């Protein structure tokens, strides 16, 4: 979990340049980044709203931890 200062800085960057804020949190080649980039190109305000949502509420670490990895059976 990010500290409050780090979160405030990412939100401030997301207000100025939404894709950059999402890139700092989730990486540059992720679905969240491309969604934010498309929304910012379509309209600045939807890009800001999605960037703040992606920074504050989406936690990729919960989805890609060791215990939730899919199990593959080889027959």
From Swiss-Prot:
Protein name, as recorded: UPF0057 membrane protein At2g24040
Membrane topology field: Multi-pass membrane protein
Taxonomic superkingdom: Eukaryota
Coiled coil residues, start to end: none
Record InterPro entries: PMP3
Family the UniProt entry places it in: Belongs to the UPF0057 (PMP3) family.
Listed transmembrane segments: 4-24, 33-53
Subcellular location: Membrane
KW Transcription regulation (keyword) present: no
Assigned GO CC terms: membrane
Organism of derivation: Arabidopsis thaliana
Keywords (A to Z) from UniProt: Membrane, Transmembrane, Transmembrane helix
